[in-house]
Amino acid sequence: MLLLGAVLLLLALPGHDQETTTQGPGVLLPLPKGACTGWMAGIPGHPGHNGAPGRDGRDGTPGEKGEKGDPGLIGPKGDIGETGVPGAEGPRGFPGIQGRKGEPGEGAYVYRSAFSVGLETYVTIPNMPIRFTKIFYNQQNHYDGSTGKFHCNIPGLYYFAYHITVYMKDVKVSLFKKDKAMLFTYDQYQENNVDQASGSVLLHLEVGDQVWLQVYGEGERNGLYADNDNDSTFTGFLLYHDTN
């Protein structure tokens, strides 16, 4: 045992070609010149424990861009997204082809008011409305044959005209609107002859206005006449109705 300890001691000492000394526990320092030499190297010690991990190194420089990879597989269809905001109005497109003809539409309402009447007898009373009882047209019944007056039911502009036969006497005829004479016609009878007299006028009427003809003056001015061959007529109709 003593021999084995001496051998181990010799192996632990530094070699003869390295001069060392110690300073503190576990620290070997070179020996000064002239120290003891000739010691043999010791046997290698056991490997030490792993040290603590070092800190992360600095980031490296970016590498070169790699080549484009192959397209990936088509993924599953996603959910429907929210409706986006309306886009800007696009440019005007080209004209389309002409469509088919549509069905006839309803026309605008037409206001109608008209009459045309004639005299059946030459017996008339002066200064009274002339009763024209021979009806040519009175579909809207705006002319009253019992009074000889036209009654306005649609406000607007009207045209009135009369054509009378004159025989045996002179005639004076006036057209009235609301008890006011608006137009006068006088014809002087020529003996042994049949005369014709006429008149026409445009009048604006309101609802409820009345228009008629009458002989004015005494009986000697009542030459209004009608028979199977000669007519005396009174006509009126609406040109256009008021829009306001």
From Swiss-Prot:
All copies of domain C1q, residue ranges: 108-244
So which tissues is this one expressed in? Answer: Synthesized exclusively by adipocytes and secreted into plasma.
Q: What is the effect of changing G90S?
A: Does not form high molecular weight multimers
Q: Which residues carry this modification: 5-hydroxylysine?
A: K33, K65, K68, K77, K101
Q: What does its activity-regulation comment describe?
A: Polymerization and secretion of adiponectin is inhibited by succination of cysteine residues by the Krebs cycle intermediate fumarate, which leads to S-(2-succinyl)cysteine residues.
Effect recorded for T21A: Some loss of sialylated isoforms
Alphabetically list the UniProt keywords: Collagen, Diabetes mellitus, Disease variant, Disulfide bond, Glycoprotein, Hormone, Hydroxylation, Obesity, Pharmaceutical, Repeat, Secreted, Signal
Q: What is the effect of changing K77R?
A: Impaired formation of HMW multimers
Residues glycosylated per entry: T21, T22, K65, K68, K77, K101
Q: Which residues form the Collagen-like domain?
A: 42-107
| Region entry Disordered, spans | 40-101
Positions of post-translational 4-hydroxyproline modification: P44, P47, P53, P71, P76, P91, P95
Q: Where is the composition biased (Basic and acidic residues)?
A: 55-70
- S-(2-succinyl)cysteine is found on C36
Q: Which residues form the signal peptide?
A: 1-18
Q: What is known of its domains?
A: The C1q domain is commonly called the globular domain.
Q: Associated disorder, per UniProt? A: Adiponectin deficiency: An autosomal dominant condition characterized by very low concentrations of plasma adiponectin. Levels of adiponectin are decreased in obesity and may contribute to a chronic state of inflammation that leads to insulin resistance, type 2 diabetes, coronary artery disease, myocardial infarction, non-alcoholic steatohepatitis, and kidney disease.
Name it.
Adiponectin
Q: What's the source species' lineage?
A: Eukaryota, Metazoa, Chordata, Craniata, Vertebrata
